Amino acid sequence: MSESHERHGIDGAAERDASDPRDEADTQANHTGVSRRSMLTASALAAATLAGRAAQAQQRAPSVAADSVAGRPFRALVRSGSTASIEDLRLRDIGPRQVLVRTTASCGCYTITRTVLGNRNVDTPTIPNHSGFGVVEAVGAEVHRVRTGDRVLVCGTPECGQCYQCLHGNPEACNYLNSQLFNAPIADMADGTGVIQQAAIGGLSELMVALEEYCIPLFTDLPDEQLALLGDTLAAGLASTMTYGRVEGGSDVVIFGAGPIGLAAVQGARSQSAGQIIVIEPVAYRRDKALELGATTVLDPNDDTDSLVQRIREMCYGPTDRLDAGGRYGPGYRYGGADFVIEASGGDLFPPAVETGPDPTGLLALRQSWEVTRGGGHLTLLAAGQQGEISFPTAQFCLSTRSIHGGQMGGMHPMRDAPRYVKMIERGAIDAAAVITATYPLEGVVAGFQRVADRTELGVVFTFG
């Protein structure tokens, strides 16, 4: 949702109910098998037939599941209590607004390590992960956005287009994300125990059942492994430079963390023609990758930790202090720094097996990211896993005119942005393949997430046959 986001339900505590409380009649359809929307659709089709326009009406109708999918066998990683294992499951039938997706690839997000590797309890058997990519196998009778056979991204951020947030231009905060409890089981274990999906997606499975609001059809020949990144890490980093903090040509950009999200932000800033891209990262191979993908400077936060903020401010000083000649900061100016800052490092959920930073809680990087944002600049917060609380000087917080953006996938507008990111990958402006360093099958999920937790791999993708 890596360094992703707590609002995705990534910790197993925010799984959500698959029913739609907006429509009482739809809820009743669970018992009658017929919903109000289905009846309205049928009435419209009948009217078109009487008018001699049946063919046209049918052409506009969505693809629907011809038969029940209940009982279909599949495998998934299931977390129950403090353990995770591959289980044989039986699918329940899908609802009128749900989409059945055969998973082909799923992104390995750092925040999911807590669920997969078992350092917290999950009360209800849960299929982990908050994104995935695959092919539509069946759709409910009221689904319009996707059709059977479509290649679809099941994104960590939904977009309904009709809720308060979507109508006010904030689809990254779509009310489907948090206000509904999508905790209805989508399958059963051998003993009949119901299984739910983390974040209503559950991407570590051969099948996903998602509301259409989470599904984005992508019309491209790009590999599934690359497209899976657009449901989480790659999209979050790109959006942080193009939506919340719209990086301007020639501007100074500072990025804390060179994991999958931070490196996506590097590529996004480069594609926006940033003048300077400074990356702070303790792991040597990740600093090297940042330079390869477009960073102009990389810094180890362990070097001169106390002077890191001042060093970055000096790098962003500009060619002159003459205010009447376009100078940024006159003598004694207190709010110097970068135009755009992205915090994508977070805290350590597990002890890394590589170089460590100066503060495993992640709070130091969070504070430093705020301190190196210039007055009037933009700070986007993408990472999760920080441990503890942080405070800021009241006067500076109120008067420095910094803009702080909480980064639900960097502010991505899924239906608008995913297709344009596809185009950027197709023409080489973004290198999605560069951040994939390992792929694993379903049987290798636990081993793959251990590598993610150790930070010995950069980007891990899980593939399904």
Identify what each model region corresponds to:
Residues T49-R72, R322-L323, P331, Y335, ...:
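C-terminal capping/lid region of NAD(P)-dependent oxidoreductase domains
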Residues E3-H5, H31-F133, G202, E206-A210, ...:
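Short N-terminal strand-loop motif that marks the start
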Residues A46, E206, Y214, F219-D306, ...:
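Mid-domain Rossmann-like dinucleotide-binding core that forms the NAD(H)/NADP(H) cofactor-binding site
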Residues E3, D321, Y335, G347, ...:
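C-terminal substrate-binding/catalytic core of Rossmann-like NAD(P)-dependent dehydrogenases/reductases
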Residues G245-G249, Q272, L293-S403:
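Glycine-rich cofactor phosphate-binding loops and adjacent beta1-alpha1 units
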Residues M1-V34:
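N-terminal secretory signal peptides
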Residues R114, C160-F256:
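NAD(P)H dinucleotide-binding glycine-rich loop of Rossmann-like/cofactor-binding domains
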Residues R92-C107, V116-L167, E172, F219-D221:
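Glycine-rich beta-strand-centered segment in the early N-terminal region that forms part
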